[in-house]
Amino acid sequence: MKKTLKFIKKNFLWLIAFAGLIIFTFIVRRLFTNNISYIDSFVYDNIKWLICPPLTQVFKIITEFGNFYIMTFILIIILITGKDKSFKKYFTINYGLVALLNVFLKSIFERQRPVDINLIVEKGFSFPSGHSMVSFAFYGFLAYYIYHSNLKKPTKYFLIILQGIIVCLIGLSRIYLGAHYFTDVIGGFSITAVYLVLYIKFVYQNQLAKEKEVK
């Protein structure tokens, strides 16, 4: 039991990436065989009864936290006020890379958006969800930085959990508003888990290399 827990702790990020890859592959295989609608229909049937004007307004606000302009605004604030030049560089690169990855993947799959619910008007293809991918990478990398910061543990965990909740709510908002299918959102989260782990490992190795150079 102790060995198992030690293995999980040591390889936690790689296990997340592996799980993300499996989920993404599962969804993609069913996309190509047109055998995925039952999953999206099941989720839609359990969400549609929640639709009401007040909740719609709430989710329209929540979804804006994954909006390009809002996240770019947050990025600019961090670039202006942040003191860690290394973090600012990697944070900006991360934002650009995941956006490009989303455009690339959408151009491959060319899945059309849902037509059953149209509480918000969106353009472009549906899979994988751009809001899900970019928000997960954006807030996820920010959470990684916070985790390794000098903040007190309660503050760290509060901010990390808060960002996790925001990302999940952004994903839910995309389904509720009819901008994406359930599998678009899960697909976006899963492939970003793979990307983010690889990117974090890359950043970590770069930082180690620089520390060795200084020594």
Model-derived regions, located:
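Membrane-interface loops
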Residues: S37-Y38, I80-K152
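Hydrophobic alpha-helical transmembrane segments
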Residues: L15-I16, Y69-F73, K88-I93, Y157-G164, ...
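Alpha-helical transmembrane spans of integral membrane proteins, capturing the lipid-embedded, hydrophobic core
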Residues: F18-I22, F91, Y95-A99, F189, ...
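Membrane-embedded catalytic cores of phosphoryl/pyrophosphoryl-handling enzymes
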Residues: K3, I8, N118-K215
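Aromatic-anchored segments of alpha-helical transmembrane domains
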Residues: I22-I27, L97-F104, I165-I175
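N-terminal transmembrane-helix/juxtamembrane module of multi-pass inner/ER membrane proteins
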Residues: M1-Y69, S107-F109, R113-L119
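Alpha-helical membrane-inserting segments
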Residues: F24, V28, L101, L105, ...
